[in-house]
């Protein structure tokens, strides 16, 4: 039987008096890529934020690795082998590539740190080439590689990706998605939040569709790609 790594059970969340999530239920099995698609303002980023403790769930339960983390502080959740690549990359622009990666591996022992940085450079040879370059002078695609690499330095078992293709050229998007596929092959569990529904669903084992804070559909990636309502709303017909 597949092990459930993450589950939301009827989770609601609010910003002040505005309800952003409405009794959302979903799960991610160990080793899966699960994608969440939806239009701008559907609540995708809020859902990731709620998983990370900000905003807090106002009702329901969030369970990670058999632990109820609903009321945990963000820092405690992040130390529980969860890492997020935020929308907009948010690299430390005045730091070099290597310094950014060091921030991601801040809690690693020296031997672990060296192993992880070697692994990140193997995934992203461009980062090794640019390791002494300031992050702020890099292209958007290189910054996205760095943001993913920085998250991987904490050796997560669950990687959260928030709109990794946003603002990138198609050739770079393909490289990023190829790397996500590689990570899955290495056993990582990935929760991918994407507006690029076509690419995301091709890659995903399963997917959820979020509309106005409600999960309205869930199925395999292939089934959602073939679904006429999904094609019409998110795949340009």
From Swiss-Prot:
Component of the leucine-specific transport system. InterPro entries: AAA+_ATPase (IPR003593), ABC_branched_ATPase_LivF/BraG (IPR030660), ABC_transporter-like_ATP-bd (IPR003439), ABC_transporter-like_CS (IPR017871), BCAA_Transport_ATP-bd_LivF (IPR052156), P-loop_NTPase (IPR027417). Pfam families: ABC_tran. ATP binds at residues 38-45. Keywords: Amino-acid transport, ATP-binding, Nucleotide-binding, Transport. It comes from the Bacteria. This is High-affinity branched-chain amino acid transport ATP-binding protein LivF. Signal peptide: none annotated.
């Amino acid at each position: 039987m597949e092990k459930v790594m993450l589950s939301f059970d009827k989770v609601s969340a609010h910003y002040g008096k505005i309800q952003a999530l409405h009794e959302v239920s979903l799960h991610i099995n160990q080793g899966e890529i699960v994608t969440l698609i939806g239009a701008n303002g559907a609540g995708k980023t809020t859902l990731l934020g709620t998983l990370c403790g900000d905003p807090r769930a106002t009702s329901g339960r969030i369970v990670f690795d058999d632990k109820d983390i609903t009321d945990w502080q963000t820092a405690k959740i992040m130390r529980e082998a969860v890492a997020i690549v935020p929308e907009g990359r948010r690299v430390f622009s005045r730091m070099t590539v290597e310094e950014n990666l060091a921030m991601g591996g801040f809690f690693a022992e020296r031997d672990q740190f060296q192993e992880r940085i070697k692994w990140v450079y193997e995934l992203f040879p461009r980062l090794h080439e640019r390791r002494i370059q300031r992050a702020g002078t890099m292209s958007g695609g290189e910054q996205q590689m760095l943001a993913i690499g920085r998250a991987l330095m904490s050796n997560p078992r669950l990687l959260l990706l928030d709109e990794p293709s946003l603002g990138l050229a198609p050739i770079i998007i393909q490289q990023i998605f190829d790397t996500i596929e590689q990570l899955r092959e290495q056993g990582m569990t990935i929760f991918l939040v994407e507006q690029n529904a076509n690419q995301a669903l091709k890659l995903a084992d399963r997917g959820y569709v979020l509309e106005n804070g409600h999960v309205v559909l869930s199925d395999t990636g292939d089934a959602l790609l073939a679904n006429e309502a999904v094609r019409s709303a998110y795949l340009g017909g």
